[in-house]
Amino acid sequence: THCDYDWTKSDLNLNEYLVGLDNQRIITYDNSFNTLQMYSRYRIMFPNSITKGFKVSGNYIITILNNNQEVVFSRKFILYEELVNVPMLVKNPRDVRDLYSKHNLEFYVKPANIALQNPVQNVKIVLLKNDIWHTAIMNIKPMYTLGTDLYYKYDKETQFWAGNEFLYFEN
């Protein structure tokens, strides 16, 4: 299922984002051996002979159903296209209290060959640390624009807790 920025189902019809069919049986699996807990590991790859590919990039949710068409689980994934450049710096926080516990991200969105319509409203930024969505930083508006470039040079809004990944930056 194709989704919008906030992971709600988009208005696109299936044939607008997918080449092929979306309802297929997963037939590739391996059973566990020499384990205390028995399990099966299922695999599916895209594109394949039934689902030939995707027409648009964006957020997707794959939903796995059992034989009774009940949801077993679902997973989010993102299909990326490199349409803009995003130079980024990881810096020390400006607040001394956060100096040894957080990292600050400064970046800007530099559209290469595409025209952005109302970019302050339409460009959606999500900052992920190690692909962990529950700590994602979202809904950041640019601090300022220069030409077509959108600049994000905040002191607090783009900070992550460093945790075990803390790096000391010495300039």
Predicted regions and their residues:
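Contiguous segments within soluble domain cores/interaction surfaces
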Residues: 1-39, 116-141, 154-171
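Exposed aromatic-hydrophobic patches
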Residues: 41-47, 145-160
